[in-house]
Amino acid sequence: AYENIVLPVVLDNQDIDEDDVNDLLESLQIEHCRDKFPEQMSGGEQQRVAIARALITHPSVIFADEPTGNLDAVSAETVAKMLTLAASKYQQTIVMVTHDRQMAEYADRILTITDGNVTGGVGV
């Protein structure tokens, strides 16, 4: 998982911040996956590795399509809290697609889209 998480940093020819990697592994509860290959991890663990990979470079905008779709309720809540913390800590904007109303509750603004049209919104 480690190589997967740091790949964007390596591709950008940046130095790897080991503290940052360790913080993500711990926050997403995947420390035990550090030396595992994808086939050795559950779907939920793979999803959290993908989220860590998205967060490692601290982009100003994160696009997340069903980021908790393959996770159990506890893991989904952990990921939601991590995304919220990252957005606050690094002043990131997160654009998220979700069908999970509980996950949507973490948002500052919610748009409801039906058949490609905005049909409602909260906090807009």
Report the location of each language-model feature.
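Short helical segment in ABC ATPase nucleotide-binding domains corresponding to the A-loop/adjacent helical element
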Residues: 2-10
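Conserved ABC ATPase signature
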Residues: 37-41, 45-47
